[in-house]
Each structure stands twice: as C-alpha cells, then as structure tokens.
Amino acid sequence: MSELKIDTRLWSSKARNLSPYVPGEQPQHDNLCKLNTNENPFPPSPKVGEAITKVLEQQADDLRLYPAPESDDLRAALAQLYDLDVNQVFVGNGSDEVLALVFASFFLKERPVLAPDISYSFYPVYAQTFGVDLIQIPLEEDFSIDPDAYRQPCSGIIIANPNAPTGLLLSLADIRKLAGEHSNSVIVIDEAYIDFAQVEAGSADAQVSAVSLINDCDNILVTQTFSKSRSLAGLRVGMAFGNASLIEALTRMKNSFNSYPLDKLAQAGATASVLDTAYFEQTCQQVIDLRQSLTAELTALDYQVLPSHANFIFVRPKDGNASAVASALREQGIIVRHFDKPRINEYLRITVGTAAQNNRLIEALQALQKNAEAVTD
C-alpha cells in the first residue's frame, strides 16, 4: 500500500499546529497478554448486556428517535448512588469528552491552568486545543504532589487522583486545601481510577473520593469514568460531579457541541451498571487483591513498585532498563506501557490483569532475569 500523502493547505492553523493525543496501542493478535491500557480484566456486570438486549428486542423501533439529551435515568441513578441532587451530575461520551468540556468551560486564556508535570498526557492536548496556557508543576522526587507548589495565580487546577501513571493518591485534606487557597478557580479532580483506591493507614480521611467534598467546596469538580472500574471502556461513558452552577456550565458547553452525546444503548447499559452495586464492589475488590499479589511478586524480583491506588502499577526494574524489558516482553506476546519521557523512562506501567495474565507476566520476567544472570556468570 502506497504511503498516504496529506495535503494541509485547507487546514486551519489550529489543526496544522496540534499535537494530538496518541491512544494506547490496541493490537489484535491471538494469545496476546494485553497489560498496557488499564482496561478492567473482568467483564461488565451481566445486567449491562441484559439492559442493552432489552432495548434492542423491545424498543428497536425507537432507535429512530434521538436519545434523552441529558441522560436523565443515568444521572438519577448516579445521584442516588452518591447521595447528590441530580443537578450536581453531568454525563458525557467518555470522561475524555467531559474533560474537554471542562477545559472549554472553566479555564481562561488570561490565566494559566496548573497540572502535575507527570500525569494524564491528554491535559496538554486539551490546553493546546482550547488555547489555554498550561503550567506543569514538577512532582516531588518520590512522585508525590506537593499542594504548596500550586500557590500561584491560575484559572484552575487539574489533578488526576490517583495520578496516572504513578498510581499515587492525594489526600482529601490536600484537595480541600487547594480548593480553599484557590476559591475563585475551579479545582478539577480526575478520578478515573478512584474506585480502586483505599484509605491509607494513618489517614484522617474517611473516604477517598473528592465527591464527598463538593457540597462544602463549590469550586471542586470531580470527573469519573465507566471505562475502568465498571469495565465499560467500549461503551464510552464519563461523568462529572459538582455544584449545580458548574454542572450548568458543562451542560451549556455540551449543548454547543453535541446535544446527544450518549446513545440509548449506552444510557441503558451504564444505568444497569450503576444499579448492580454488588457486582461492582466484588470486581473492584478482586482487582485490588490481584494488585496486591502482583506488587508482592514484582517486589520479590527486585522491582521498585510504587504504592498504587489504581488498576495498574508503576514499576522500575533493578537496572532501570525498562525499555529493554518492555521489548523482551513484547516478543513473548505481553504488552506493557513504557513512557520514553524524562524522569519516568526507567519505569513501566503495568495493568493489573487476571490471575492467569499476572502469572504469565511474572513467569516471563523470571525467565528474563535468569537469562540475564546466565549471561553475567
């Protein structure tokens, strides 16, 4: 196939100058052990498929009609789950769309937005797309976030919590502190992985999610996703929680781009997922248990493992040659994520898989270690 030649003469200067986000690799090979994009190793609640099937079997004719523009049933279910008013809940076509609307709704060109320098790589893309100045605040040596480093004028702060790709958790006390010190700016807490987080020993926090703060702090907006803990990455459903004024701003912006972001099937499936709390709690705990066992096994192999509150772990091989390890694993059909960036290029981000996937990974790493030892003997 000949190489596609791109003619940019009809492009806007914005399109010409963008540096788009690069999605995680989605290879399609048999017997692949895919541990690179933080998908849930377990299927969604069976009730999701049942709800979607019911729509197709009983309401297929209604697919000619537009879906509910505000996803009323889903928002009501989420409001009940978090003990909120429905006007404090927003839903969109994946949390990536929700985050894009956040940048468009709250961050100003006149004042910068602050974010950690090592975090979700979509944030700089949003900033560039919407013409917002993004100042990236360096993480501490141990990859933690120092709230005092954010004491500067800004139109907002966005922090992934747990952070990605480190998996570290910022306390609710620190989030409340940021909100208090920046009372005229929106503090966005991106909680894509929060359902895998646990209250740390010695913490004064009774909970881990900043949703618990939004009634006290009117400038905190929390985003979440159905992609990770609810195993619905293929359905594309995200949400935001905040005071009614923040949610109204998102709704106005949403209706200026796409008034119907969630189709009928996505709304039905996502609502069923929210209502099946038993399955949700069970699978989240399974991932946490698998994360703990994988952490122990990698530590035994002399890998430095950061304390993770997500469905992935961030690890450093003893010799720091993460790129070589990733390449060697790929040759055996095991895909993990390596970031060729300063400060983290010696680390790998590894999704927590099923017990079988984790065992396959550990066995491959053990074999690599034995081969390396044989070469040096």
Question: What are the language-model segments listed below?
Answer:
Residues 59, 71-112:
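Phosphate-binding glycine-rich loop
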Residues 45, 70, 219-299, 303-306:
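PLP-dependent aminotransferase class I/II
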Residues 288, 300-332, 348:
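Conserved PLP-binding catalytic core of the aspartate aminotransferase-like
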Residues 105-160:
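PLP-dependent aminotransferase-like
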Residues 173, 327-332, 337, 341-377:
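PLP-dependent enzyme catalytic core of the Aspartate aminotransferase-like
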Residues 2-65, 152-153:
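N-terminal "arm"/small-domain region of PLP-dependent enzymes with the aminotransferase-like
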Residues 128, 144-153, 165-229:
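Active-site pre-lysine segment of PLP-dependent enzymes
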Residues 15-23, 307-311, 315, 332-352:
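Conserved PLP cofactor-binding pocket of PLP-dependent enzymes
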